[in-house]
Swiss-Prot record:
Protein name: Non-structural protein NP-1
Main location: host cell
Location of region: Disordered: 1-90
Biased composition regions of type Polar residues, renumbered to the chain: 60-73
Length: 219
């Protein structure tokens, strides 16, 4: 065969391509197309193993946080339950003492007056100042001028009560009623544990005890 015929045959072979090469090309295209196809559609409610954590990380975190918060609240309530029942204040101590000692003199003394004034301040916040705020508020808000006026009114009232108490202690240093009730409460403090007395009485508890005491006295 001449060299010219050989060259023509070789060119024709390159243009057509070998059967093996064409088969490899089709196989690669088929494989590449399958790898890029979407995953099969699942029925409603079905998810992949990792889809939930990818699509709902916020809801998952919120549920965990809410659970921890609820557990902490329950632990706090459990740890504090029972303590409030053991705590006392002058109102409760004096009312119990008077119940067993009807001949006791009228209320007086440092513990009585200091607790009474603290009760008056709490009562002013929950009742008088609340009503005044509701009269002045616009969209449940008041300005600084009105706020200052409310605070000064309360200060003026409490200042007068403290001045009256100081005047009494200065001019009646030998008040029998003061000595009696202060001694009652000192003896009470000597009989209770330091752990119980370290627990502070809340304003709500003080107000509730005072109201109960006044109701008992009126009856």
């Amino acid at each position: 065969m001449s060299s010219g015929n050989m060259k023509d045959k070789h060119r024709s072979y390159k243009r057509k391509g070998s059967p093996e090469r064409g088969e490899r090309k089709r196989h690669w295209q088929t494989t590449h197309h399958r790898s890029r196809s979407r995953s099969p559609i699942r029925h409603s409610g079905e998810r992949g193993s990792g889809s939930y954590h990818q699509e709902h990380p916020i809801s998952h975190l919120s549920s965990c946080t809410a659970s921890k918060t609820s557990d902490q609240v329950m632990k706090t309530r459990e740890s504090t339950s029972g303590k409030k029942d053991n705590r006392t204040n002058p109102y409760t101590v004096f009312s119990q003492h008077r119940a067993s000692n009807p001949e006791a003199p009228g209320w007086c003394g440092f513990y009585w007056h200091s607790t009474r004034i603290a009760r008056d301040g709490t009562n002013s916040i929950f009742n008088e100042m609340k009503q005044q705020f509701q009269q002045l508020q616009i969209d449940n808000k008041i300005g600084w001028d009105n706020t200052r006026e409310l605070l000064f009114n309360q200060k003026k009232t409490l200042d007068q009560k403290y001045r009256n108490m100081f005047w009494h202690f200065r001019n009646n240093s030998d008040c029998e009623r003061c000595n009696y009730w202060d001694d009652v409460y000192r003896r009470h403090l000597a009989n209770v544990s330091s752990q119980t007395e370290a627990d502070e009485i809340t304003d709500e508890e003080m107000l509730s005890a005072a109201e109960s005491m006044e109701a008992d006295a009126s009856n």
